[in-house]
């Protein structure tokens, strides 16, 4: 059996209407994943795929995942999310769809737009280090090299201020609708001698599996299976889980004073097959002896007792760096929205606004600001209203990032930079 190709999770980011859905459709079509019968009519022929996914998501239908995977010579790609999707920003942050790389789509006619900036900033904040810039809709500017260079320059300046190394980022003139430079090299851009989009994807670096870090498995669901017992389900973020290991679930264990939430792993299952060991990226169900279905819940994190997950209780605080994405008025001290961190959702209080920061450079603009408005970044002190697991982003980034939600929208995004345990 041939070794499976390495796997990369890919996000498509960029301003609304710059052609992300069309590009996804074009990629899937040109790589043979979808056929003519899957396409729509006229201008929207490629968008249909993403629109269908969108509707299925909205209705809560299980998505046909075959339509979100494609292969290059070196890799198998999964398209983890497409913006435009209501919860895109939340998903991007909470790791429901942790991307390893992203394609930033910028329309040649519009250039950089507000969401171009927001998505690029988020990608950097979320640790997406590998970026490819697709300058799309070249057909609308008659494949003009000068216009391409203008937009390229504009995007490069933006990415530099955010902290990307622009020399390592491929910029590619494409037309998703016409198919130029997506999979096939285009005759319409004789002035361009770089890779096609597919070639650039094939040149990405594979993500490193953090197997040497302590075990962390945020729990998505807990099932009770007759004849088996309690089966928590989740994705291994860091470390390795083996049959026979003792695992502890936090904050369940701490919250019950150690009475509940620890047991022995009897079996591990992935894709309906039993496995002996699970690594980062594996979505697994595992049976734990000595843990009842009601002892643990979504938002708990499985870890090894000798390297337990960090629990922050209402007696503790943590310092976070956040950026306000959309707040109707302003955030002040005392504000208590819901923090979505890995699979946990916990109301947390803004204890103190420490300093306002320039989102591009990270420099301090103002000490102890009175409030924070949309577009501003800050360092803040946060106190959870109940125990939760969160890690410092420098230690375990997968569990250090969060989205802040209120009024049905993502208000802010951020990361935990320092945990302050009560002495």
Swiss-Prot record:
One of its GO terms (cellular component) is cytoplasm. Mg(2+) binds at residue 21. GTP binds at residues 14-21, 81-85, 136-139. PROSITE patterns: G_TR_1, G_TR_2. Residues 81-84 are annotated as: G3. SUPFAM superfamilies: EF-Tu/eEF-1alpha/eIF2-gamma C-terminal domain, P-loop containing nucleoside triphosphate hydrolases, Translation proteins. One of its GO terms (molecular function) is translation elongation factor activity. It holds the Pfam family GTP_EFTU_D2. Residues 175-177 are annotated as: G5. Transmembrane segments: none annotated. Residues 136-139 are annotated as: G4. Keywords: Cytoplasm, Elongation factor, GTP-binding, Hydrolase, Magnesium, Metal-binding, Nucleotide-binding, Protein biosynthesis. The keyword Protein biosynthesis applies. Residues 14-21 are annotated as: G1. It comes from the Archaea. It catalyses: GTP + H2O = GDP + phosphate + H(+). It is found in: Cytoplasm. The keyword Hydrolase applies. Residues 5-211 form the tr-type G domain. Gene3D superfamilies: P-loop containing nucleotide triphosphate hydrolases (3.40.50.300), Translation factors (2.40.30.10). Its EC number is 3.6.5.3. Belongs to the TRAFAC class translation factor GTPase superfamily. Classic translation factor GTPase family. EF-Tu/EF-1A subfamily. This is Elongation factor 1-alpha. It comes from Methanopyrus kandleri (strain AV19 / DSM 6324 / JCM 9639 / NBRC 100938). The lineage of its organism: Archaea, Methanobacteriati, Methanobacteriota, Methanomada group, Methanopyri.
